[in-house]
UniProtKB/Swiss-Prot annotation:
GO annotation, biological process: bacterial-type flagellum assembly
Chief location bin: cytoplasm
Subcellular location: Cytoplasm
Similarity field: Belongs to the FlgN family.
Protein name (Swiss-Prot/TrEMBL): Flagella synthesis protein FlgN
Length: 147
């Protein structure tokens, strides 16, 4: 019975890793598109965080179950568990590389935006926006106009 519970746990982790693979692929598509849609990217990031939190919980449950029945991954004595564990390791490794790639793409976008802001700030001598995030008034012929 306890081995069945462990098998179910590993199955749930596999399902979540497959879902995470889909979410990471969506994130990569967004990061590779010409212009990032912040709200959409935020939603994908929240999905990713939720899946990772659930995976962390399931993994902690797995470790507790292993301790209780004195068994440990890679489960070489239980073929059904060993097969699932191997698949988990393969998916996790692929996700690690995909996530690293997405991180590099995101870093490129951040650097591009930082450079663009630096150009804007040097050309105009000062920030286009005030501390409140609203556009500063522009002066034309000695008069201040608010936009």
């Amino acid at each position: 019975m306890v081995v069945e519970r462990l098998q179910t746990n590993l199955g749930q982790q596999l399902e979540l890793l497959e879902s995470l693979k889909t979410v990471v692929a969506q994130e990569q598509q967004l990061l590779c598109s010409g212009r990032i849609q912040g709200i959409v990217l935020q939603g994908v990031t929240e999905q990713k965080s939720s899946i990772l939190a659930t995976l962390a919980y399931l993994d902690q449950t797995r470790l507790t179950t292993e301790k209780n029945i004195n068994i440990q991954a890679p489960y070489s004595n239980v073929p059904a568990l060993a097969e699932r564990w191997q698949r988990i390791l393969e998916l996790a490794e692929g996700l690690r590389y995909s996530n690293l790639h997405n991180g590099l793409l995101l870093q490129q976008h951040i650097e591009h935006n930082t450079q663009a802001l630096a150009v804007l700030n040097t050309r105009h001598g000062q920030s286009l926006y005030g501390p409140d995030g609203h556009a500063k008034g522009a002066s034309l012929l000695g008069r201040k106009i608010g936009i």
